[in-house]
Amino acid sequence: MSANYVNYRPEVEQKQENEEEDILHITEQMAQTNNQVFDRHRHAVRDAHAKSHGFLKGILTVPENLPAHLAQGIFAHPGYYDVMVRLSAAPGDLHSDKTPAPHGFALKILNVPGQRLLPNDPSDGHHQDFLMVNIPVLTFGTVRKYKQMLPFITEAEQAPEPVMRSLRQVMRGVDYLVNRAGFPAPASLKGLARSQHHVLGETYHSMAALRYGDYIAKISVAPESDSVKKLTGIQMQINDDSAIRDIVRDFFQKYTADYVIRAQLCTDLRTMPVEDAAVLWKEQESPHQVIGHLHFPQQDTFSPARRVYSDDVLSFNPWHGVTEHQPLGSIMRVRMQAYERSSSFRHRMNTQPRTEPVSYTHLRAHETRGN
């Protein structure tokens, strides 16, 4: 079966012309926006996914007897790992939940084996981060398109809240944004603007590709237990600016949640490219295959200590991980520099140490100090 999958080799990545200059331009523009947001709040936030909805701790189970093409990287051997998840809204500022936005599911898997991607990994070299969003593709799938789109994204995020809250205006805004940048919006992005589906019932995607051991894949997380499956497609009742925080918190006070983590392996680089994250990898060509199970028990997802820990202390970066899950494509390459620069700024301005958890003990220490 593995013969149908494209083998990873360094040549699958092809740097774009003037890519380094484009990356420098993007990171400088993002740093400028970061400073502007800091001046508004007198507190530094992430330049993407600034607002958190909740912070979860749970367990990843890697099952026994995965087939060879799936038993790759940190999923090569059965076992259990502690995990942490930060749920968030995508914009790089603190907007009202009444404003429709993509949502994020940042997964940190603790104490994984394997050679590190970065020689001087600021994450202390223990974990694997997978960053996912409830959209399967990016409108700006390359660094060049991202550079074109960036001023319009910044302009849209600075629009007055009443304008942003109108679903119709958001849908028009998506078209307006991408048309001004010179390329069409994917149907998946337009569809996102139609409603605010329950964040715990959504499927989350890495959007861009990464190495999956001997192969190439995109990673996703989907609801597994009935407790979250029944929330899929359900409209959230958002009556105040931080309603999603309360929706998530109320859920985990009563219920547990289970999700599957999946890999969609590349079968053809022509139709499933790594250098353009705007191209949807069709399930007819390669279905999503289960590689693990995530379990989240009942818990308080937004205590004051957890909010500070997830928003100010922790970092999530697709380059915090092992070589067998190397991020691929120009969008992932720009993230290497952009995320590092943003994290450094955030920790410095908020006078927080750049540390990573060795276990849940690190989180418990913060919760104890918060009591």
Residue ranges and their predicted role:
Residues 361-368:
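Conserved small/polar residues in nucleotide/adenosyl-binding loops
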